[in-house]
Amino acid sequence: MPTDTKRKAHDQEPTADSSDYDSDGSEEPDFINVDFDFRAPEEIDFQALKRLLQQLFYTHNTKLDLSSLADHVVKTSTTQGVGTTIKIVDDEDQDPYAFVSAITLSSEKKEGSEAANSLSKYLLEVTSKPSSKSVHDVIKSAASSTSTNAPVIAVLHERMVNMPPQVAPPLYKMLLEEVQASLVSTSATRPSHYLFFSRVFSADAFSDDEAMDEDDDDDDDEPSGLAGARKRKAKLARREAKKAGAKKDAPKSRTISDGMALAGSSDEELGLFHPEDIAISKFASNSLTYRFPPPPDASDSFEAPLFGRIALVPADKMDALLQQIETDLSMPAPQ
C-alpha cells in the first residue's frame, strides 16, 4: 500500500506584478516559492481526476468512461502503488493540480477491466483509418483478449495549464519506477511500448489577417464574461506571434510558455500544452495526430482547434526519454 505523501518538490513560479520594474523601466520578474506535494491518489480526488481527464480528452471525453478511468487511477495507487497527484503543501484536502497514472490496454471482458476496455476501444476507434494503420496494429495486437504479444501500457497524465513544466520529470520518473516495481511483484509480462496521449492546438488558426482585424476592433464591441476573456487572450497571443516575426518566421519547436507554442506538423503548425511532448515525439516509433470536433460554442469563444496526439514509445527507450525530458525541463540554476 503506498504511503499517503510521496515526496515534496520545491519550485518557483513566476507571477506578473505591475510594480516589478527597475529604475530604467525594464521589467524584473517576481517569483513566489511554491512547495508541491507529490501524493498518492485518494478517493477524495475522484471528481477532480474526472475533470482533468475531461480536459485531456476534450470533446471526445463522452466516448470514454471517465468514471471508470478516474476510479482506476485511485485503485491502482491503492493496490499496486502506481500513480501520483500533485497538491500544494498544507493544502492536501484541495483538488490536485496534476496527476499521472498507467493502465495496461486490454479488451478482455472481466470485472475491473472497464477502464482498460473503454480506453482501448477509444484508441482503436481513432486509429481506425488506413493512414494510422501502424499505430492501430500495435494497439490492436496488444489489447486483444487472445493475444500472446507483449502488452502496451498507456500513460495517463494531465495538469492544469498554469503548472510549471518542471513538475513533469519527477512525475514520469516516479511512474516508471512504480510500474517496473509492480511488474516485478506481479510477475507480469513487460510491455513492448508505452503509449502517451496529449492535446495540441492549432497555431494556424491565428492568421496575420485575423490578428490585424482583431487589433483594429473597438474594445467596446468585445463580448463580456468568459467569451470576452477568451477573445482578449487570443488577441494577445496573436500580437505576441507577430512580434516574434509571425508564424512563417517563428521557430517550430517553441512551447506554450513562450506564447504561441509552435511545433511543425505537416502543413499546420501545432502548439504544445506540454513541452515534454517534443522529447516524446523524438523517441516515438509510431505517432498519430487527429483533430477533435469543436465544442458547440467554439465560434463564440474564439477557441483554436484542438487535436489529440498518440505517441508509442518502445519500452527500451523509456530511460533515455526520461533523461531527455529532465534535460529539457530542468530548473535554471539560481542566480
Swiss-Prot record:
- The segment annotated Disordered runs over 1-32, 210-259
Biased region (Acidic residues) positions are 19-30, 210-223
Does the record's keyword annotation contain Nucleus? Answer: yes
Question: Which cysteine pairs make disulfide bonds?
Answer: none
In this chain, composition skew of type Basic and acidic residues spans: 1-13, 237-252
Tell me the InterPro entries matching this sequence: BCP1_family
One GO CC term of this entry? Answer: cytoplasm
Question: What UniProt keywords apply to this chain's record, in alphabetical order?
Answer: Cytoplasm, Nucleus, Protein transport, Transport
Subcellular location as annotated: Cytoplasm; Nucleus
> Organism's domain of life?
Eukaryota
Q: Which Gene Ontology terms describe the biological processes this protein takes part in? A: protein transport
- Biological function: Involved in nuclear export, actin cytoskeleton organization and vesicular transport.
Can you say what this protein is called?
Protein BCP1
Species in which this protein is naturally found = Mycosarcoma maydis (Corn smut fungus)
